[in-house]
Amino acid sequence: QANASTIANNFVSANVDLILANATTALQACAAATTDIPILGTSVTDYATALEISDWSGTTGRNISGTSDLAPLDQQEDMLVELYPDAKHVAILYCSAEANSKYQATEFEKYLDEDGISYKEFTASDSNDIGSVVQSATEYADVIYIPTDNTMLKSVIRNSATEHRSNQQYRTSGRNSDYCRRGRYL
């Protein structure tokens, strides 16, 4: 966050015409740095959550616009059910410091509820906690769902969660292309 704030403040000091903020942290830093310079966001899942807008109307009502990277959660849940029809317990694994991840988890849970699938959230506050959280999740779940979550993505790819479930089938569900390249994607 500190680096993003420094960069955003440098843009404001340079009086740039437009700021392109890539990801939630950058968007939040830019939003805090200026209310005048137009900001375009990208790789932001939910603007209302990222900007703490409680009465969301579909626009921010300020100098910020952009695109969302949210893939339809109902379709993700449908795919999970189709690929793993025997799944009874889904672990939802995310970093509690990422507001957009919490948003996705909460929304995804609604679809699991509709299909009568039990779930439990497993959160890590930072990358130091992920190993033990993944271990707990693999002990609970038939399938692990990981929303778009940069902290979790980096750690799960770096330290394969499959190490925690040796000699057992391990299934993950997520929507990031890096999961796919490493064989951890639906």
What are these regions (language model features)?
Residues 1-186:
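Short hydrophobic alpha-helices and adjacent helix-cap/hinge residues
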